[in-house]
Amino acid sequence: MSEEKKVVLTREYIINLRRAYVVSRTKRAKYAVGLVRRFIARHLKVEPKAVKIGQRLNMAIWSRSIEKPPRKVHVVVEKYSDGVVKVELKE
């Protein structure tokens, strides 16, 4: 009946978030999350809606408040057979 999701592809990326520092201070962390989403969508050829940001990655981006997201994040990306892409912070 229901098909199990299988991992089709696994990759690691270091995503540079320095462009988030171009926008105003009160929008940087939210913009950085969007940068991650767009970067992964472009590299794995999926729609940005299909990219799911993991909780640990989200906490890492927001850890120093909205004004000071990290300059880079090291992530692990898994693409599933149904087209969904999950992004997690690398340990």
From Swiss-Prot:
Coiled coil ranges: none
Transmembrane stretches, start-end: none
GO BP terms: cytoplasmic translation
SMART domains listed in its UniProt record: Ribosomal_L31e (SM01380)
GO molecular function, one term: structural constituent of ribosome
Cysteine pairings via disulfide bonds: none
InterPro entries: Ribosomal_eL31 (IPR000054), Ribosomal_eL31_CS (IPR020052), Ribosomal_eL31_dom_sf (IPR023621)
Gene Ontology CC: cytosolic large ribosomal subunit
Pfam entry (one): Ribosomal_L31e
Superkingdom assignment: Archaea
Record keywords: Ribonucleoprotein, Ribosomal protein
Family matches, as HAMAP family: Ribosomal_eL31
Homology family: Belongs to the eukaryotic ribosomal protein eL31 family.
PANTHER family per the UniProt record, alphabetical: 60S RIBOSOMAL PROTEIN L31
Protein name: Large ribosomal subunit protein eL31
Organism: Pyrobaculum islandicum (strain DSM 4184 / JCM 9189 / GEO3)
Encoding gene, per UniProt annotation: rpl31e
